[in-house]
Amino acid sequence: MSVRDLTILGCSSQQPTRFRNHGAYLLRWNGEGFLFDPGEGTQRQFIFANIAPSVINRIFISHFHGDHCLGLGSILMRLNLDKVRHPIHCYYPASGKKYFDRLRYGTIYHEMIHVVEHPVSKAGLVEDDGRFKIEAAFLQHGIENIGWRITEADTRKFDNQKLIDRGIRGSLVKELQEKGQLNLDGQTIYLDDVSWIRKGDQFSVVIDTLPCQNAIDIARNATLLLCESTYLEEHKELARLHSHLTAKQAALIAKEANAKQLILTHFSARYQNLKLFEQEARTIFANTFVANDLITFPFTKVNLKS
């Protein structure tokens, strides 16, 4: 079984602290590595997490404030140093193309990796490669800023007991799967009679925004929602002034979106006790947890029928 988890490489907003690095988040899912918003120092955090950066094949930048992208150049150079052979797909707001280029080409090195750019200029479907569907929504942060939703493809699952009851095994299973029906002992058995469609899980990221409908929409029905909560509710005016969320507001988004699990991140350096964020959010959305550097959260499969 492939690894399915979310590792918090950093969870601080704007500036790192003694205990929290700039934000960066690695999602390992079905043999792929999705890196979100690599801030300064991300490469070193991989060492502490005991994860090889070569697992990365997709990088997402929500916007081009420094704490969300300053680690991009060093990560690309590290992948180049490691001579990774797979393409590195990079998704970012199209309006930030010049900043992407500055980060990518900010120093002298011979780039040998294959970087595939996906500048996003409109909301909606960005890519569907048959394994994952990637969607974007524009959030409210004063500059162009994107929330992401990644959904795995639906898969068909056989009901083993139904196969046994009908005497279907071995090559007959393959025939049924390929043809959609099977004639056995004078009876026609259809694929739907002995199987069901498992709905693909969904991961959503809402980083740096005021409360808005787009944040709810991109988080809709997320199996796992990673959401910023820069401030506690007692500082909600600061959150409004800087276009951020409080823990309470993040929880309201998760609740309204019908998310299954919420991970809070992107904490202001003014706070030491992150449990306060968890406590505040859980009054509204019980299945809430706080990020902390180098913590790994399991991304558990949810077997829902489509």
Swiss-Prot record:
Q: How is the cofactor bound?
A: Binds 2 Zn(2+) ions.
What residues bind Zn(2+) 1, as annotated? Answer: 63, 65, 141, 208
Keyword set, alphabetical order? Endonuclease, Hydrolase, Metal-binding, Nuclease, tRNA processing, Zinc
Task: Supply the EC number(s).
Answer: 3.1.26.11
Q: What Pfam families has UniProt attached to this entry? A: Lactamase_B (PF00753)
Locate the residues binding Zn(2+) 2.
67-68, 208, 266
Give the protein name, as stated in the record.
Ribonuclease Z
Q: Which organism is it from?
A: Protochlamydia amoebophila (strain UWE25)
